[in-house]
Amino acid sequence: MTVSTAFQNGDVDVAQIFITDLQKLWLEQDLPISTYVDEAPYQLCMTMPTLFFNTEVEGLDQVAVRKAIAMAVDYDQVISSAMSGQSPTFADVPRSVMNPTDGEQAMVDQDALKEYQWSNADVEGAKKLLDDAGIVDTDGDGIREYNGKNLSYKAECPTGWSDWNATLEIVAAAGKNIGINIETYFPEAANYNTDYSTGNFEITMQSGPGTSVANPYMRCRFFMSSDYNDLEVNFSGNFGHYQNDRVDEILAAIPHETDDAKLKDYYTELSKIMLEDCPCVPLMYRPQVFHEVNESVWTNYPQKDDGTNVPPMDCTDGYGVAALYNLELIDG
């Protein structure tokens, strides 16, 4: 029996798993299941599963190639299909180094970033970007070349991670639409961990820090800090070995800055650099942990705006433990 089946049967009270089309459990099957938020995205999204390009791989060392792939991706399909609606869209919360929570969004100037954003699945814009860079298909095989070699890459994440697997298939389709061959590769988790942590990949997917007292700063390091580039084994971030001196200057300055306006300027500039250079590309917003409850035995679990301020941390982590004191037996 899978965890999902046990949860739906009522053998598990609280689940921390991704369930495709979660809302169908109560809308169609009429099960006593609820989430922290009643409406889509149903969860409190605080992390950003992200595409990383290996900038030491020929072709992917070119901004035009990385950005073209980023522009061509159908993010709405990622969110509606791969995530089955369990994420805000980038129209709702435009991409930046920030997660979609109100506290972090207040720390970035989204108006200043508007000119650097791209529309969803902008295939024609991506093609033009590549054409203008002289990266074209010269032999008619449907694949563009750079330095005489086809742009052909492998994108990987662990097998069995259904939402991530589906997301990379959408990325691969985006590549095909603009003349870049991207093949998906779904190894066992142990092999995937070895690949991304040692730089043995071309395109990979990883999820960064969520919400904590160390963020958004540590997430910015995760996205773009060159401090990790010389590590033989790196589980910390910037897996594609991106190098940008201005990024490093800002990251060195932030811990010493106390002025909120200046910090906002720094985080806005980091967002601008990420959007312009595309060393990595956030693909969706996602819960730090999933929080689904089956109320066949216990009820009164925490929900958004219920006045308790207990976070959706599965009743086990940090102040989330406080949820246990509010539970009531259904037949009590």
Regions from the PLM with identified roles:
Residues M1-N9, Q117-S119, I135-T211:
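Ligand/substrate-recognition segments at binding pockets and active sites
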Residues M1-V57, A68, D76, S80-A82:
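Extracellular/periplasmic solute-recognition and catalytic clefts
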Residues T2-T5, N9, L51, V63, ...:
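Solvent-exposed, polar/charged alpha-helical surfaces in well-ordered, non-transmembrane soluble domains
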Residues A6, L25-E28, S80-G85, F90-P94, ...:
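Short, solvent-exposed loop/turn and secondary-structure capping segments
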Residues D13-F18, E202-S207, P282:
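Paired acidic/hydrophobic, glycine-rich loop segments that form the ligand-binding mouth/hinge
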Residues W26, E56-E104, E115-D131, S271-P282:
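Periplasmic-binding protein-like
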Residues S80, A133-P158, S207, P255-N294:
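Bilobed periplasmic-binding protein-like "clamshell/Venus-flytrap" ligand-binding domains
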